[in-house]
Amino acid sequence: MDEKGERIPLTICDYDREAGTITIVFQPVGASTTKMKELKAGDYFRDFTGPLGNASELVEEDIEELKKKKILFVGGGVGAAPVYPQVKWLHEHGVDADVIIGSKTKDMLILEKEMEAVSGNYYPCTDDGSYGHAGMVTTMVEELVEKGNKYDVC
C-alpha cells in the first residue's frame, strides 16, 4: 500500500481491463486493511502483486461438460468475494450456477446485484432473518436438497 506496508493476500473479485482497475473485497481487521478502508475512489496502492495462487479448477473442465452439471456455490461474508469471479466466468461461458450467500444482516450482504446478474438462482441468507432466507447458509443448502435439488459440484 505504501513504503511501510506489508504483503497481505486479497481476492481479486473483478477487473476492468479498459480502465486498468481491479476490485478487491476485504474486511478491516488489521493495520493494513484498516488503512485500506480509508482510501477513496481514485486513490491507489504504491505496489500490488498478483494474481497469485491457482485458478479455479472449473476453468480446466470442458465447457460442454460443465453445462450438463448442476453447480452450487456457497459463501458467507467476505467469502462471497472468491465466489463471484467464478460464477461470473461460468455465466460468460453459458454455464448456470446456483449461489447461496450469507451474512449476519442485510446491511452486511455484499455483491448482491452482481451475484443476481450472473447466477442461475441466487439465495441470500441472513443470520438475523432481516432479508432472504432466515438462518445460516448451511440450512439453505439443506432446504434445497430436501426440495429435491441435486448438485454435481458444490
Identify the meaning behind each predicted range.
Residues 33-154:
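FNR/FR-type flavoprotein reductase catalytic core
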